[in-house]
Amino acid sequence: MFYSIVAIFVGAGLGALLRWCLSLTLNAFFPAVPLGTLAANLLGGYVIGVAAVVFTVRVGLPPEWRLFVITGFLGGLTTFSTYSVEVMTHALEGEFGWALAVAALHLTGSFALTALGMWTARAWLAAA
């Protein structure tokens, strides 16, 4: 149990730190669509796709790795609450086009990158 807690704790801290760095670095480029949040969610979509395949195929991996990557790191990195407030801020300010654009970018982008991550992992594992 101790190692599970440590895996989640360390993963979450690293994921949250990366999300913060992405926001600091990218949000200033295009304020209408906070690119840091988008990048975190898209990267998280790709990594969860890879992880879903790897942890399904490589059943011998210690369970702490799954906790570290999926529960910890991706839990700290991705952010549905920030995405939600960014979409609703646009909507409440009457910027419905921006609200829909931000929502569509996050959802379609994340689904597409999750599929790409799964494809990447399957190709990588088949070649190994």
Curated annotation (Swiss-Prot):
GO terms for cellular component: plasma membrane. Na(+) binds at residues 75, 78. It comes from the Bacteria. The chain crosses the membrane at residues 2-22, 35-55, 67-87, 96-116. GO terms for biological process: cellular detoxification of fluoride. Disulfide bonds: none annotated. It is found in: Cell inner membrane. Keywords: Cell inner membrane, Cell membrane, Ion channel, Ion transport, Membrane, Metal-binding, Sodium, Transmembrane, Transmembrane helix, Transport. It catalyses: fluoride(in) = fluoride(out). The keyword Transferase does not apply. GO terms for molecular function: fluoride channel activity; metal ion binding. It is a multi-pass membrane protein. Na(+) is not transported, but it plays an essential structural role and its presence is essential for fluoride channel function. PANTHER family: FLUORIDE EXPORT PROTEIN 1-RELATED. Fluoride-specific ion channel. Important for reducing fluoride concentration in the cell, thus reducing its toxicity. Belongs to the fluoride channel Fluc/FEX (TC 1.A.43) family. This is Fluoride-specific ion channel FluC.
